[in-house]
Regions:
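Bacterial Sec-dependent N-terminal signal peptides
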Residues: 1-21
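Cell wall/extracellular polymer interaction/catalysis modules
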Residues: 18-207, 216-255
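Short cysteine clusters
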Residues: 210
């Protein structure tokens, strides 16, 4: 993981308005140490349906090999938006405008993100840090909270300073098992929060910003992920995937 020194001047669309923004230096997750990757691609920025494929490699110098068959997923109800953590920009923008991921935009983040923990409604074996959901388990989406973009137990966090959160156990079947996606890991205010892999409502309905799939595939992912292999989610529209495939050394997809 390296800090890149290039600074780009670009136009971003936030809350429907185009603004000029010069980003500070950001960390790009090159996942040099990753041995597991979940690749999610969509047709374009606005498409809700997409495809996921698992990959693994034996060493950091090995070629990525696909694991099992690809399967369908859905992303945010409004498609994808570029993560503010990345300072390299895609060329396949929407009419020259680049949508950046923001809180409450109904879009899933595009980029490369660590997969850091698993949650479930019941106890289960896990090779990632595990959280069993309780009535008091919440993911905080209040941008003014010190716990913004964290899964917490409201009775143990200490400073209960938020006015908005997701009561995870009450979500029901869609959160029977899921994975925390470390998007906005620096917890930049308004950069987006509570992004998960989880079970979908159905194959047509987009999410509030997560990536969702059939229960059997979510279970398979939860059993497969291993913290020792530094797993990542690589999530991009197909044209952006092709743009960065060589530079970021992304897994080769079947045509």
């Amino acid at each position: 993981m390296k800090v890149l020194s290039f600074i780009f001047l670009f136009s971003a669309v936030i809350f429907g308005q185009v603004i000029n923004k010069t980003p500070e230096k950001k960390i790009v997750y090159k996942y040099a140490d990753s041995l597991q990757a979940i690749v999610v691609t969509t047709k374009d920025w606005s498409t809700v349906q997409g495809t996921a494929q698992l990959f693994e490699r034996k060493t950091t110098k090995s070629v990525w090999k696909s694991v099992g068959k690809s399967f369908p997923i859905v992303v945010g109800k409004n498609g994808l938006a570029w993560s503010q953590e990345l300072n390299e920009l895609p060329s396949d923008t929407n009419n020259g405008r680049l949508l950046m991921k923001t809180e409450g935009d109904g879009k899933s983040p595009a980029g490369i993100f660590m997969l850091t923990s698993i949650f479930a409604a019941t106890e289960r074996k896990s090779n990632l840090p595990f959280t069993k959901l309780k009535e008091s388990t919440e993911c905080v989406d209040d941008v003014n909270s010190a716990s913004y973009n964290k899964i917490v137990d409201k009775f143990q966090v200490g400073d209960y300073d938020w006015n908005s959160s997701e009561k995870m156990l009450s979500v029901g079947e869609q959160y029977e098992v899921g994975v925390f996606v470390a998007h906005n890991s620096e917890r930049q205010k308004g950069g987006g929060s509570c992004i998960f892999l989880h079970i979908w409502k159905n194959s047509e309905t987009g999410t509030a910003g997560c990536t969702a799939m059939e229960k059997s595939n979510m279970e398979k992912i939860a059993d497969w992920l291993d913290a020792k292999k530094n797993p990542v989610l690589i999530q991009l529209p197909m044209d952006s995937y092709k743009q960065f495939q060589t530079k970021w050394k992304l897994p080769k997809l079947k045509s």
